[in-house]
């Protein structure tokens, strides 16, 4: 029997560089200490050593216009963590409101807890009527693991029975017949906001759409807006609902599910946010310890590296953040090596422009969108940027953006209507898995 041996080799560099002094930091100094050290190091070329522990960030760390180079290194691999989650100890309360109790699933009666988001300075706007992904929507974390947003069904999908109206009108979206009787339980939820996520027209593009009406007598669902339609008409790319290969009635295999609904919290760890009350509801995980519960709500990047050269970051774990991780913009010969990215719910790492930047020997897991998005070079003049993406390990990405979120995306662009082009010239991607 043949065995496959995989070696992920950390990319190390001399620390400190010859002639550099070392600025040593502890977790108690937090992001202010890191920012102050960066400003000092950018002037005299010092190296920064982060001692083991959790560094809680309340705003972005900025490295701007630094031309002398800085090395930022964690003392021990996996022991230095930059994170952005808020602890929720002491914030959970029993549900007392009678109307809310009446909505709770039988499995969660007397168990479900609530958090008043206004008490922790979080305000969550309603979802838009139509979206491709949840944006600026907080995420609960327990023991450094993402807790699942309430969903029906808990696993798998619902399927449209038959499409009655593909495109809708100016006033509403398409209409379809459903099969699962659970829909009847959601009629009263429509008033305060009910959203379905589905692969309405093609099986590789998910849309989340607000529901205008559920008719339990006719067993129909009507969307509030059309999907890739205009004024109730197709825009020319087989918009609307129902498989574009089986018009007008659809294939009966179009997948969808409901999420963020109080009525469907029925398993430990599930949660939702009620936009009207601005309260979060949670079915506590098994063997629950509130010291391990936290929430992420800030969307600013963890680190911005802008117009800078020779910035090197090694042995740091970036974790528990709603926004992007590290952004490298118009920079030269920067290196991110031997780092871990976990529970970063935007893009974990972005390179925009610049030249000869390296992303090497990092781990990525539970990423909301893309692990690495990289662009650069000049396509018209065939000038290479020479960025390198090498020896990285990817698991579980596209956790929030369910489609068009690869491990590595080359060029900055959006798909579908209004394609935006970007440069991806002379980028090497090799030995990743």
Tell me what each language-model feature is:
Residues 28-329, 335, 342, 350, ...:
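Extracellular polysaccharide-degrading/modifying enzymes targeting complex plant/algal/animal polysaccharides
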Residues 406-407, 432:
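C-terminal structured domain segments across diverse proteins
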């Amino acid at each position: 029997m043949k065995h496959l041996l995989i070696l992920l080799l950390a990319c190390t560099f001399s620390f400190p560089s010859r002639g550099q002094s070392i600025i040593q930091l502890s977790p108690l100094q937090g992001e202010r200490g890191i920012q102050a050290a960066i400003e000092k190091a950018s002037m005299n070329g010092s190296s920064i050593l982060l001692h083991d522990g959790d560094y809680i960030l309340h705003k972005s760390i900025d490295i701007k216009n630094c031309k002398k180079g800085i090395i930022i290194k964690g003392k021990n691999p996996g022991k230095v963590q930059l994170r952005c989650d808020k602890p929720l100890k002491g914030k959970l309360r029993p549900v007392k409101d009678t109307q809310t109790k009446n909505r709770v699933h039988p499995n969660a009666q007397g168990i479900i807890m609530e958090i008043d988001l206004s008490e922790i300075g979080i305000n969550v706007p309603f979802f838009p009527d139509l979206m491709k992904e949840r944006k600026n929507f907080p995420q609960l974390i327990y023991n450094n693991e993402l807790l699942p947003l309430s969903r029906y069904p808990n696993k798998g999908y619902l399927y449209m029975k038959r499409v009655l109206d593909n495109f809708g009108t100016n006033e509403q979206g398409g209409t379809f017949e459903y099969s699962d009787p659970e829909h009847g339980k959601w009629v009263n939820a429509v008033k305060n906001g009910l959203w379905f996520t589905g692969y309405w027209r093609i099986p590789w593009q998910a849309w989340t759409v607000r529901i205008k009406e559920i008719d339990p007598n006719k067993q129909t669902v009507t969307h509030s807006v059309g999907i890739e339609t205009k004024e109730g008409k197709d825009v020319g790319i087989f918009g609307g609902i129902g498989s574009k290969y089986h018009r007008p009635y659809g294939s009966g295999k179009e997948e969808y599910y409901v999420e963020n609904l109080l009525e469907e919290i029925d398993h430990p760890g599930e949660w939702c946010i009620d936009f009207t009350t601005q309260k979060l509801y949670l079915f506590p995980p098994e063997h629950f310890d509130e010291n391990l519960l936290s929430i992420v709500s800030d969307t600013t990047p963890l680190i911005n590296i802008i117009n800078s050269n020779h910035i090197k970051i090694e042995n740091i774990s970036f974790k528990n953040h709603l926004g992007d991780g590290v952004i490298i913009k118009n920079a030269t010969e920067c290196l991110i090596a031997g780092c871990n990215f976990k529970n970063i719910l935007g893009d974990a790492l972005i390179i925009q422009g610049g030249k000869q930047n390296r992303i090497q020997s990092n781990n990525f897991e539970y990423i909301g969108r893309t692990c690495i998005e990289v662009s650069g070079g000049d396509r018209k003049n065939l000038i290479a940027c020479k960025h390198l993406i090498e020896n990285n390990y990817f698991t579980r990405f596209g956790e929030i953006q369910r489609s068009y979120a690869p491990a590595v995306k080359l060029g900055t662009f959006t798909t579908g209507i209004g394609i935006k082009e970007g440069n991806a010239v002379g980028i090497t991607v090799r030995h990743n898995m």
